[in-house]
């Protein structure tokens, strides 16, 4: 049987080009920011232009280009090969779609045969209104339009098990310690995640608690490899009060604790983007560390891709009602 898997992320322009950043910012404002911030309609174009311009200027000044979409492509190819090894009797096809970039999820779904099942795999560390629920809502709306024309099911898979993600992340960090011959009592481990609102304007799952559990689980596994384990949030500014401590405050605490060697790992992201890479870079250089190791995200790490494949395969043996994304 032919089976389809769609990896879904926000997407992100690869270059600082203002037109691309503007369109991306506009789509995020319409599809995400208004979920958490009651922004009047007339202000949306102004905010989109401001956000697009600020990203263009920052990326240009930092000579930065986002690897997110190219990484997602590599993840997709790796996952397809892992699925073929795991269940060779099926004909696996892994695709990539984005929430706020082309190809959009609905565009990809329209292109797939109506009689072939589809599993959608949101590439986020925690399930929240800003991650998996966006995909679920998109699929529900799309399915209502598709109606009876869609014979095979379309399912949005849950997030990876928290302890499993922590295991994979901790082993990834441990391998980096061994390869680089670093770590010990004079090193600090700094764990970074995307921030979220503490008091959203309406009840919603923010993913904060799940993210904190993953962070704590990584810390438990690696606490004896470092002199201290710290965590911080990469926050935005609009919409209200955000998660604490912000990364700036965390790094001040690390420095005040006497650490001069830092291993920085953005555990809350499954693929590198401007927030995991560029924001971390900017915050870290505000201090005169002796040594900084900025680890990439899990990206296409073989153990991580293998875990994704097992996740897809185990999900497929469950009853359809348990997995329905519509």
Residue ranges and their predicted role:
Residues 1-326:
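Extended amphipathic ligand-handling, pore-lining, and cofactor/metal-binding catalytic surfaces
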């Amino acid at each position: 049987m032919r089976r389809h898997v769609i990896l879904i992320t926000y997407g992100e322009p690869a270059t600082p080009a203002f037109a691309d950043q503007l369109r991306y910012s506009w789509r995020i404002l319409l599809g995400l920011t208004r979920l958490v911030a009651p922004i009047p309609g007339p202000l949306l174009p102004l905010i989109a232009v401001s956000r697009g311009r600020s990203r263009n200027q920052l990326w240009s000044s930092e000579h930065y280009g986002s690897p997110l979409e190219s990484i997602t492509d590599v993840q997709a190819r790796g996952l397809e090969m892992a699925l073929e090894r795991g269940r060779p009797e099926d004909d696996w096809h892994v695709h990539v779609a984005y929430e706020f970039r082309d190809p959009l999820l609905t565009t990809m779904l329209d292109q797939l045969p109506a009689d072939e099942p589809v599993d959608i795999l949101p590439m986020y560390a925690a399930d929240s209104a800003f991650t998996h629920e966006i995909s679920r809502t998109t699929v529900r709306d799309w399915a209502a339009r598709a109606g009876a024309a869609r014979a095979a099911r379309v399912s949005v898979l849950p997030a990876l098990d928290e302890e499993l993600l922590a295991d994979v992340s901790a082993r990834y960090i441990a391998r980096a310690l061994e390869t680089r011959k670093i770590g010990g009592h004079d090193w600090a481990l700094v764990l970074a995640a995307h921030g979220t609102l503490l008091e959203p304007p309406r009840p919603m799952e923010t993913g904060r608690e799940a993210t904190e559990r993953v962070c704590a689980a990584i810390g438990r596994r690696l606490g004896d490899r470092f002199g201290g384990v710290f965590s911080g949030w990469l926050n935005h500014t609009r919409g209200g009060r955000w998660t604490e401590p912000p990364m700036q405050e965390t790094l001040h605490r690390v420095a005040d604790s006497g650490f001069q060697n830092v291993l920085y790992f953005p555990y809350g992201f499954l693929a590198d983007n401007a927030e995991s890479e560029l924001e971390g870079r900017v915050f870290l250089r505000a201090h005169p560390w002796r040594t900084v190791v900025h680890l990439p995200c899990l990206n296409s790490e073989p153990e991580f891709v293998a875990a994704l494949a097992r996740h897809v395969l185990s999900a497929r043996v469950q009853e359809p009602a348990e997995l329905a994304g519509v």
